[in-house]
C-alpha cells in the first residue's frame, strides 16, 4: 500500500509543472521587458543627441520668413536699436572715414570726382540693408534657441524613466572599474572642462552662446565669467567627489587627490 495517495502525488506533480512553466514564462516576460526598456532608452539617448542639432535648423527655416515679414511690415526696429546701435555707428564712421580719405587723395592729385556722393549714398543704403538683415537674424536665432531649449527641456522631463535606466547603466559600468581607472576618468573629465587649459574653450563657448542669443561681444563679461564660473564649478565638483566617494570608496578619493597633485 502506498503511503501517499496517487491523487496527492498527481496534484503535487501538476503544481510543480505549473509552477515551473509560470516561472519560465515570467523569466521570458522579464527578459522581453528588459529588452524593450533597453531599446527604448537607446532610442531616447539617440534622439537626445540628434534633436539639439535638428531642431534649430528646422525651426530657423520656418521662422525666418515670418520674422522677415514681421520686421519689414511692423515698425519694430526700436526693439533692437540698443543692441546694434554701436555696431551701426561704427560702420557708418568707417565708411565716412574711407570716403574722406579718398577725397583728400583726389584733391591732392588735382582730380575732382563728381560721383563721390553717389558712392557714399550707395554704401549707406548697403549698410542699412546689412543692419536690417542682422536684426532679422538676431530675432530668428533668439526665437529658435528659446523654442528649442523649451522643447529639449520638456523632452528630458518627460523621459525621466529612460534617463534613470541610462544612469543605472553608467553607474554599473563606472563602479565595475578599478579605483585607479575611476580616478583617471574623473581627472580626465575635470581637466577637459575646468582644467588649466580650458579657459579658451570657455571663451569660445560663452561667445558663441551670447552671439546666438543676439548679444554683442563684450570682452569684460566674457573674461569675468571665464575667471569665476570654472572655479565655482571645480569647487562644487571636488565637494561632490568627497561627499559621494569618501563613504563608498575612500581609496578612490586618495588616488584622485594623489593624481591631481
UniProtKB/Swiss-Prot annotation:
Transmembrane segments: 39-59, 138-158, 184-204, 221-241
Annotated catalysed reactions: K(+)(in) + H(+)(out) = K(+)(out) + H(+)(in)
Subcellular locations according to the entry: Plastid, Chloroplast inner membrane
Entry-linked InterPro entries: CemA (IPR004282)
UniProt key word Transferase: no
Any one Gene Ontology cellular component term annotated for this protein: chloroplast inner membrane
Membrane topology: Multi-pass membrane protein
Keywords: Antiport, Chloroplast, Hydrogen ion transport, Ion transport, Membrane, Plastid, Plastid inner membrane, Potassium, Potassium transport, Transmembrane, Transmembrane helix, Transport
One annotated GO biological process: potassium ion transport
Highest taxon above the source species: Eukaryota
Family, per entry: Belongs to the CemA family.
The protein's role, per its UniProt record: Contributes to K(+)/H(+) antiport activity by supporting proton efflux to control proton extrusion and homeostasis in chloroplasts in a light-dependent manner to modulate photosynthesis. Prevents excessive induction of non-photochemical quenching (NPQ) under continuous-light conditions. Indirectly promotes efficient inorganic carbon uptake into chloroplasts.
Protein name: Potassium/proton antiporter CemA
Biological source species: Pinus thunbergii
Amino acid at each position: 500500500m502506498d503511503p501517499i495517495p496517487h491523487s496527492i502525488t498527481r496534484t503535487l506533480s501538476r503544481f510543480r509543472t505549473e509552477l515551473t512553466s509560470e516561472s519560465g514564462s515570467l523569466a521570458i516576460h522579464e527578459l522581453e521587458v528588459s529588452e524593450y526598456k533597453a531599446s527604448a532608452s537607446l532610442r531616447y539617448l539617440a534622439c537626445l543627441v540628434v534633436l539639439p542639432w535638428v531642431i534649430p535648423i528646422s525651426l530657423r527655416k520656418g521662422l525666418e520668413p515670418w520674422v522677415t515679414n514681421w520686421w519689414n511690415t511692423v515698425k519694430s526696429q526700436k526693439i533692437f536699436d540698443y543692441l546694434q546701435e554701436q555696431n551701426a555707428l561704427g560702420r557708418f564712421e568707417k565708411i565716412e572715414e574711407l570716403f574722406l580719405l579718398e577725397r583728400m587723395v583726389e584733391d591732392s592729385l588735382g582730380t575732382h570726382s563728381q560721383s563721390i556722393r553717389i558712392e557714399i549714398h550707395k554704401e549707406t543704403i548697403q549698410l542699412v540693408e546689412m543692419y536690417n538683415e542682422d536684426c532679422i537674424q538676431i530675432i530668428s536665432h533668439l526665437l529658435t534657441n528659446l523654442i528649442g531649449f523649451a522643447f529639449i527641456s520638456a523632452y528630458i522631463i518627460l523621459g525621466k524613466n529612460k534617463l534613470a535606466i541610462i544612469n543605472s547603466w553608467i553607474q554599473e559600468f563606472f563602479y565595475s572599474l578599478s579605483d585607479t581607472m575611476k580616478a583617471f576618468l574623473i581627472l580626465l573629465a575635470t581637466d577637459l572642462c575646468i582644467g588649466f587649459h580650458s579657459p579658451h574653450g570657455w571663451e569660445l563657448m560663452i561667445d558663441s552662446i551670447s552671439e546666438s542669443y543676439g548679444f554683442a561681444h563684450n570682452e569684460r563679461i566674457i573674461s569675468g565669467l571665464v575667471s569665476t564660473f570654472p572655479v565655482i564649478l571645480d569647487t562644487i565638483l571636488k565637494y561632490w567627489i568627497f561627499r559621494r566617494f569618501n563613504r563608498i570608496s575612500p581609496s578612490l578619493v586618495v588616488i584622485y587627490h594623489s593624481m591631481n597633485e
